[in-house]
């Protein structure tokens, strides 16, 4: 199990990403707009840099919903490989079974 503080940190990052998503997207649109003036683009860059670091989506880490494990995460299930295997062996994931050939 991951530490509770790490889970809380990820939850805080998720809130920040949601809060600043529109503002961040608008600033990036201005920066990539070739028709905008250099001054507007530069101001957008400075404003983007002044936003909280954790408001960037790339700072988030996918974690297992049950254990909080950061590695071996499977997006399709939202779980780590270990928990997916346990659930599969119990038959809790429909249509998923152990491979044999």
UniProtKB/Swiss-Prot annotation:
Signal peptide stretch: none
Entry's family note: Belongs to the universal ribosomal protein uS14 family.
The protein's role, per its UniProt record: Binds 16S rRNA, required for the assembly of 30S particles and may also be responsible for determining the conformation of the 16S rRNA at the A site.
Subunit structure: Part of the 30S ribosomal subunit. Contacts proteins S3 and S10.
Pfam families: Ribosomal_S14
Keyword entries, A-Z: Ribonucleoprotein, Ribosomal protein, RNA-binding, rRNA-binding
Gene: rpsN
Protein's GO biological process: translation
Keyword check for Repeat: no
Any one GO molecular function term: structural constituent of ribosome
Name of this chain's protein: Small ribosomal subunit protein uS14
GO cellular component: cytoplasm; small ribosomal subunit
